[in-house]
Amino acid sequence: MKTLILFSTRDGQTREIASYLASELKELGIQADVANVHRIEEPQWENYDRVVIGASIRYGHYHSAFQEFVKKHATRLNSMPSAFYSVNLVARKPEKRTPQTNSYARKFLMNSQWRPDRCAVIAGALRYPRYRWYDRFMIKLIMKMSGGETDTRKEVVYTDWEQVANFAREIAHLTDKPTLK
């Protein structure tokens, strides 16, 4: 069995999570390829038994390239076992780590034609020193309003790697949908 893991990232944390998922799946005996949804032209769907897509939030929105990819490939995504993970800083709060309690994931799933079999909401990373001035200012303002870290010299990884490992185990059990050839 082979899994395609696609990601849409702004600052790299969604890519790190995708790589971690691939590593966890490998330990479970499942081969996985990882690719950036912004750079992949057309996936070779017939080479995969399942697909996982992760996307990050910036200023309340997923990247348009991710949304366009999902819209374009919704029929294919629905025809095979699939999973979605949303990465955002709101999920640093444990009560905001489910598709039901995270407004970004909930809104995306309600409005999307894609119906993934599994979903996760995973906390991202706050990397102030890597941000451009404007992003550092805006994210600090948002974090101040939401009770988060405001020291712009810090980098904080909120990702719960055990949650990611558990999600990999869920992905490993995705089966039973016929794939389109």
Curated annotation (Swiss-Prot):
Disruption phenotype: Loss of protoporphyrinogen IX dehydrogenase activity, grows very slowly unless supplemented with heme. Accumulates intermediates of heme synthesis such as uroporphyrinogen III, coproprophyrin III and protoporphyrinogen IX.
Cofactor(s) annotated in UniProt: FMN
Stated regulation of activity: Anaerobic activity is inhibited by pentachlorophenol.
UniProt keyword list: Cell inner membrane, Cell membrane, Flavoprotein, FMN, Membrane, Nucleotide-binding, Oxidoreductase, Porphyrin biosynthesis
Pathway: Porphyrin-containing compound metabolism; protoporphyrin-IX biosynthesis; protoporphyrin-IX from protoporphyrinogen-IX: step 1/1
Any one cellular-component term (Gene Ontology): membrane
Cited InterPro entries: Flavodoxin/NO_synth, Flavodoxin_CS, Flavodoxin_dom, Flavoprotein-like_sf, HemG, Protoporphyrinogen_IX_DH
Name of the protein: Protoporphyrinogen IX dehydrogenase [quinone]
Organism per entry: Escherichia coli (strain K12)
